[in-house]
């Protein structure tokens, strides 16, 4: 009997069930992924016991010589991965990384430009519900109604009109390549700083499959999960001249002690990301997303912007007579996990929506390729077109189960679950 089962059987059972859920369903949420056993091992290590306020070599606690090794490895590997001057691996999340940048570069009430959440942006880019929308004067930009891609002319017009202190670039539901050079040129016209949040596309950026913002932006933030396939956490990079202020805004500005077991796991993930195999994996993510998109379009589904350049796609269900919420629930009942998502100019609220967001990082981690994506597109279409037919949904669920068995996940853990 495991220590956890003996101490807390309720939590042990929840973990067992979640293990089986992940292994037995098709995970298509764009922000989720499956970390390696090595990352899991590091994340669950005894470094969780160590307090280490401060930075390597400059801690407020004794006994940090070995956690310093882990943090220095994470920093140097991340620098090599992105070609950054300065990296801070302590942020607990992407939002806290963004917060550290804001507190480093802005004063309360300063004007920032950020992508409209309803057009694919992120809460921490100026949503009124988030601290960023409460502390700063936020001017949202969005996508063009016809192309559904970022309207750079609008961005420039807004920048010239409002003279922002910072332009925030990045998205949580945008399927196309972001032109960081254009944002840099616009910012230079008004003397603005640029922060790029690459949380969703970090793996693609690290492997050269998406243009990098690091050479052209003062600040770059990211999560360490999603396409980077590391533990849940954040990081922030900046040009050398900003590092002293930024480091003091991470600690003690917005955080106390870093999570050293998570930083150790970040170091492992960064090492994995520096391999040729990881580049092949990222390339396959994009191939899979594009294969999935092509098959869905062929089956009569409209995708926002007409397709994808990266790891995700947005399905517009407006003309299908169902909401994103209904689609998510129907697909989940058949073993396919997606999330309801607003589409640009959506008339439905965020808890209902007119679309769903689909991503390929997790299934690519399982080894699935274009052939499986075409099968999955067919299964998605069958569920949405026969969502009231219980017999049909069960047939899809059985096919999903067979597909998952052919691409096993965490085999040893499943065997003991």
Swiss-Prot record:
UniProt GO BP: glycine biosynthetic process from serine; tetrahydrofolate interconversion
Catalyzed reaction equations: (6R)-5,10-methylene-5,6,7,8-tetrahydrofolate + glycine + H2O = (6S)-5,6,7,8-tetrahydrofolate + L-serine
Binding site residues for (6S)-5,6,7,8-tetrahydrofolate: 117, 121-123
Cystine pairings recorded for this chain: none
PROSITE patterns linked: SHMT
InterPro entries: PyrdxlP-dep_Trfase, PyrdxlP-dep_Trfase_major, PyrdxlP-dep_Trfase_small, Ser_HO-MeTrfase, Ser_HO-MeTrfase-like, Ser_HO-MeTrfase_PLP_BS, SHMT-like_dom
EC number assigned by the record: 2.1.2.1
Enzyme class: transferase
One Gene Ontology MF term: glycine hydroxymethyltransferase activity
Any one GO CC term of the record: cytosol
Requisite cofactors: pyridoxal 5'-phosphate
Pathway info: One-carbon metabolism; tetrahydrofolate interconversion; Amino-acid biosynthesis; glycine biosynthesis; glycine from L-serine: step 1/1
Domain of life according to the entry: Bacteria
Keywords: Amino-acid biosynthesis, Cytoplasm, One-carbon metabolism, Pyridoxal phosphate, Transferase
Chief site of localization: cytoplasm
CDD domains per record: SHMT (cd00378)
Cellular compartments annotated: Cytoplasm
Alphabetized SUPFAM superfamilies for the sequence: PLP-dependent transferases
Site (Plays an important role in substrate specificity): 225
N6-(pyridoxal phosphate)lysine modified-residue sites: 226
Summary of the function given for this chain in its UniProt record: Catalyzes the reversible interconversion of serine and glycine with tetrahydrofolate (THF) serving as the one-carbon carrier. This reaction serves as the major source of one-carbon groups required for the biosynthesis of purines, thymidylate, methionine, and other important biomolecules. Also exhibits THF-independent aldolase activity toward beta-hydroxyamino acids, producing glycine and aldehydes, via a retro-aldol mechanism.
HAMAP family: SHMT (MF_00051)
Family, as annotated: Belongs to the SHMT family.
Subunit and partners: Homodimer.
Protein name from the UniProt record: Serine hydroxymethyltransferase
Gene giving rise to this polypeptide: glyA
């Amino acid at each position: 009997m495991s220590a956890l089962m003996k101490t807390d059987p309720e939590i042990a059972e929840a973990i067992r069930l979640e293990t089986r859920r992940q292994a037995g369903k098709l995970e298509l949420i764009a922000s989720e992924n499956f970390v390696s056993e090595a990352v899991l091992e590091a994340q669950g290590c005894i470094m969780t016991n160590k307090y280490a306020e401060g930075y390597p070599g400059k801690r407020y606690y004794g006994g940090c010589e070995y956690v310093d090794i882990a943090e220095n490895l994470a920093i140097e590997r991340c620098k090599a991965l992105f070609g950054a001057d300065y990296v801070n691996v302590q942020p607990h999340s992407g939002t806290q990384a963004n917060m550290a940048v804001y507190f480093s570069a802005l004063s309360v009430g300063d004007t920032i430009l950020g992508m409209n959440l309803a057009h694919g942006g992120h809460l921490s880019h100026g949503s009124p519900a988030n601290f960023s929308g409460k502390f700063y004067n936020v001017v949202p930009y969005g996508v063009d109604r016809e192309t559904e891609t970022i309207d750079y002319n609008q961005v420039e017009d807004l920048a010239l009109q409002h003279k922002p202190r910072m332009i925030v670039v990045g998205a949580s539901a945008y399927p196309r390549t972001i032109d960081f050079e254009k944002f840099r040129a616009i910012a230079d016209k008004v003397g603005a700083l640029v922060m790029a949040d690459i949380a969703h596309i970090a793996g693609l950026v690290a492997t050269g499959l998406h243009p990098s913002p690091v050479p052209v932006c003062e600040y770059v933030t990211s999560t360490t999960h999603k396409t980077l396939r590391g533990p849940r956490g954040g990081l922030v990079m900046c040009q050398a001249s900003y590092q002293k202020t930024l480091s003091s805004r991470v600690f003690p500005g917005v955080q106390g002690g870093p999570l050293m077991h998570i930083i150790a796991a970040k170091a492992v993930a960064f090492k994995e990301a520096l391999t040729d195999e990881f580049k092949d994996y990222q390339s396959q993510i994009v191939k899979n997303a594009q294969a999935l998109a092509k098959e869905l379009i062929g089956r009569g589904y409209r995708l926002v912007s007409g397709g994808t350049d990266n790891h995700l796609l947005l399905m517009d269900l407006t003309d299908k007579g169902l909401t994103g919420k209904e689609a998510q629930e129907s697909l989940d009942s058949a073993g396919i996990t997606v999330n309801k998502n607003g589409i640009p100019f959506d008339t439905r609220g965020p808890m209902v929506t007119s679309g769903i967001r689909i991503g390929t990082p997790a299934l690519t981690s399982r080894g699935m390729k274009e052939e499986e994506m075409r099968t999955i597109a067919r299964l998605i279409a069958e569920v949405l077109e026969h969502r009231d037919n219980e017999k049909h949904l069960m047939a899809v669920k059985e096919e999903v189960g067979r597909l998952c068995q052919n691409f096993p996940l965490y085999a040893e853990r499943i065997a003991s679950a």
